[in-house]
Amino acid sequence: MAACRGFLLRRINDSCLTFRRHKFKKKWATTLPKIPCSRLALQYFDMNYSMQFGDLWPSIRISLLTEQKYGALVNNFSHKETVLKNLSAFNAKDFISEAQHVISLLQIQNNLDTSEKMTSGEASLNLVGQKNNAEKTQATNLLSSLSNTKLTCFKFSRGDISRFPQSRSDSFGLLEYYLMDAASLLPVLALDVQHGHSVLDLCAAPGGKTLALLQTENCQYLAANDLSTSRSSRLHRVLRSYVPRAQRTEHKVCITSQDGRLWGDAEANTYDRVLVDVPCTTDRHSLLEEENNIFHRIRTKQRQMLPLLQAELLVAGLRAVRPGGEVVYSTCSLSQLQNECVVERAVELAASDHGVHVKPQDLSCFREVFKNTFNFFQGCRVGELVLPHLTANFGPMFFCKLLRIE
């Protein structure tokens, strides 16, 4: 009998489930499959940009996922004539000189139309469209500046996917040209820096636009700032590689690493021109690169706070420019929230909180003179937006010009 009871107890013990308490609870983040940041970015863009751009989104989408097209910004401090000859040998063309040719043709046609309409007694249609006198003057001055700019940037024709070789050093040790998204020059051209101007580049690194500002040879003084010390170091390297020491003395170029939002208090009403090329979602980078991707889960809050940061930086830029001066705001994002909405919000904040009144400027003339190089979106409330396209895979690049009213 005792043996039978022992046998039954062993069978019961063997069949019972025993519960074991683990030291740590498993986290969902370690058990669920990890989604790449680039995939998260694509999902986000599909959800938002498909509504923003409608039927245009599939074309933009495939262009963003395809290799970007580059332009070659010629270094005016190098042996320029030799560089122009070498780049022309690649069957590349300077898109700025092409735009200057378009401006000349439009001006000739406009003069002919004006003469004919004055003879027939009809109203004249100006090259810059149906605008009031102040807007006509501003647009005419901008076109005149485009006609006389010293910037030169080569690009391959539409549909040509050739790539420029890496730049070589000249006899002075300076690199001959700088490879960059050609659309990144549009904010610099829109800024319209004139001879003797003091200029602030509020978010300067990695340095392409800063270098372009110096290539205009119009900056009497250039302040280049970026919050990141590592990115500021890269900016230093870029300028050392392209600009002679005599052109980047502390009296001509000052590189700082400060919070750009404080610039409005530190140097209010100081500069003739201010470029505010803000941190953004960098749409193309977010789709193609995992490293330093703003769609990483640990950067979710940072991404959500971007429009606020952008508006604060733009307000600082508007305060730093003197009355009568101009500010250009730019991003490399397609997002309305980071583009038009930020501009509109910053204009309101500058007026209500600081008594700084500004007026957005019409840049529609850029669509006309650069239409052979870039694809522009027609639906912006303010500013202009370059859309990526497979035949001309530049951008995205949004830029908006603001005039501080005296």
From Swiss-Prot:
Subcellular location: Mitochondrion
Disulfide bridges in this chain: none
Reaction equation(s) it catalyzes: a cytidine in rRNA + S-adenosyl-L-methionine = a 5-methylcytidine in rRNA + S-adenosyl-L-homocysteine + H(+); a cytidine in mRNA + S-adenosyl-L-methionine = a 5-methylcytidine in mRNA + S-adenosyl-L-homocysteine + H(+)
GO molecular function, one term: RNA binding
InterPro entries per UniProt: MeTrfase_RsmB-F_NOP2_cat, MeTrfase_RsmB-F_NOP2_dom, RCMT, SAM-dependent_MTases_sf
Gene3D superfamilies in alphabetical order: 6.20.240.40, Vaccinia Virus protein VP39 (3.40.50.150)
Residues binding S-adenosyl-L-methionine: 207-209, 226, 231, 259-260, 277
E.C. no: 2.1.1.-
Gene Ontology cellular-component terms listed: mitochondrial matrix
Keywords per UniProt: Methyltransferase, Mitochondrion, RNA-binding, rRNA processing, S-adenosyl-L-methionine, Transferase, Transit peptide
Keyword Transit peptide: yes
A Pfam family reported for this protein in Swiss-Prot or TrEMBL: Methyltr_RsmB-F
Keyword Transferase: yes
Any one GO biological process: mitochondrial RNA catabolic process
Active-site feature positions: 332 (nucleophile)
Physiological role: Involved in mitochondrial ribosome large subunit biogenesis. Mitochondrial RNA cytosine C(5)-methyltransferase that methylates cytosine to 5-methylcytosine (m5C) in various RNAs, such as rRNAs, mRNAs and some long non-coding RNAs (lncRNAs). Involved in mitochondrial ribosome small subunit (SSU) maturation by catalyzing methylation of mitochondrial 12S rRNA.
Homology family: Belongs to the class I-like SAM-binding methyltransferase superfamily. RsmB/NOP family.
UniProt cross-references to PANTHER family, sorted A to Z: 5-METHYLCYTOSINE RRNA METHYLTRANSFERASE NSUN4 (PTHR22808:SF3), NCL1 YEAST -RELATED NOL1/NOP2/FMU SUN DOMAIN-CONTAINING (PTHR22808)
Name this polypeptide is given: 5-cytosine rRNA methyltransferase NSUN4
Organism: Xenopus tropicalis (Western clawed frog)
Gene: nsun4
